[in-house]
């Protein structure tokens, strides 16, 4: 029996062949994706870095920063990528059976080893593989020492993702930041300029029964996306809807502030989202273990005594913010601060800051996110015609206004700030100079501005800091009959109480919100 002079491939070589073929599939997918779409997210996995593109393409690449030039790579010729024989410098192109260059846009080459020990390639399982030849036309021996890793690193920065190849080349793609990668919500925090995307197919976090909405939003003809208002001109731009993916894209510029972005159908609001542009909020663990955000929802900062610490106002159970402002208003000039402090999109004249003496439905509130509702006769000073105690809850709901990972707190979250309706020396302290309250636990201190509130009767801002001290009113998620509980504090008084977390009030008031961790 004649003996084959060529030994069979080792297990190590067979594994290299398998790894190389898997890498070639990934490389082809990447080469196509970077030219057609943006990177939506990056994630470290056990198998490598998973890149998700906005068109839905997902690729996982295994990287080796120390890897050298591989057996096969890619290079640009004209306006297209072609497969290369990386070991060859003068004639780098990997050739097909007819001797022509092989475009990356075509079939993926499948690499193997023939029974004589040479590298082979084919593009179809039904086609007999041919030997890979070097620049002199000689077959390339599969020694087992070849480098088969194709990716050196994946790095993101300045709005781009750079994928370094081991053959010295680079694939580059624009990157958008996926705001909903950690979960969907009615508010998203943005801390740097750039292009962003979020999932517009889900209302809020998609949870909570009895809130009056279906969690899912079905894309339909006539749908678009746009901004409705911003308190910093040019803060958001390029708002657009991809009806295929159901994603909303937007560009955030320099500065800090707030904006409301909406999914529209035939000029009417289907759902809206609060884009909150601020330094990345920090957290503080209170004495009872509740983890709070370090600022009011919608605030640009945390400066004691500074208006940057003022957040937005919210009617209880509604997800959409009402502009805060820095001055007290009267019923005659209610929302003057909002009109002077924000830019409203002129493309939608029916959508502007307004007060309505009539109650509405949850659908009506969602369709008119800039209208402050109150029916003081028919509903017990509620904005909702049929009061609903499930719109917010200690389990985050679809209508909760906080960003992913946060929710409106329960009233018990503030229990260690209070003793007998009074401040606690060294723990919760009224600051009469900066008009607000500090809460200290351990080495951390939180600032609560006395930001007042929007009155139920007109929507006017009242209770802001003044010579009489001002007051703070912060909603909780808990309810009492047709009212809801809130945290209230004011200048230190000898009687009648200075701070209380067990007061309940009509849900049509516009109070501030301090989000806590879910």
Question: Whereabouts are the PLM-identified features?
Answer:
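Collagen/collagen-like triple-helix sequence repeat recognition
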Residues: 1-179
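Short, compositionally biased
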Residues: 124, 165-168, 175-396, 480, ...
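C-terminal, surface-exposed recognition/capping segments
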Residues: 170, 299, 378-518
